[in-house]
């Protein structure tokens, strides 16, 4: 089961953009596309990856919503994708 139920609610077909903090070319596609590409990244690139959402999500313990997913959250989505594919 995915650690964060908020991440589990993000649909695979939601539009998203994966960016790299080092300025590489972004991946524009869906959450599924971003999760698939994240798995292919080397550890250094994973640490610098972020996903910009088209719909903000709530954060536990915060009053505001966010448009950005951190590497740990992208890894959870990649794990969810792996489990659902099997």
Which role fits each region the language model picked out?
Residues 2-22:
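Short aromatic-glycine-(Arg/Gly/Cys) micro-motifs in beta-strand/loop hairpins
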Residues 10-11, 43-45:
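A generic structural signal for short, solvent-exposed coil/turn residues
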Residues 21-29:
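A short, exposed loop/beta-hairpin motif centered on an aromatic-Gly-Thr core
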Residues 29-44:
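A short, charged, amphipathic alpha-helix used as a generic interaction element across diverse proteins
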Residues 44-51, 82-86:
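Short, surface-exposed secondary-structure junctions/capping segments
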Residues 67-86:
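Helix-rich interaction surfaces within compact, conserved domain-sized segments
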């Amino acid at each position: 089961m995915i650690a964060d139920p908020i991440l589990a609610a993000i649909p695979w077909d939601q539009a998203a953009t994966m960016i790299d903090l080092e300025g590489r070319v972004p991946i524009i596609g869906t959450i599924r596309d971003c999760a698939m590409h994240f798995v292919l990244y080397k550890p250094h690139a994973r640490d610098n990856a972020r996903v910009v959402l088209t719909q903000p999500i709530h954060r536990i313990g915060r009053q505001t919503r966010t448009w950005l997913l951190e590497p740990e959250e992208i890894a959870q989505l990649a794990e969810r994708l792996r489990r659902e594919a099997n």
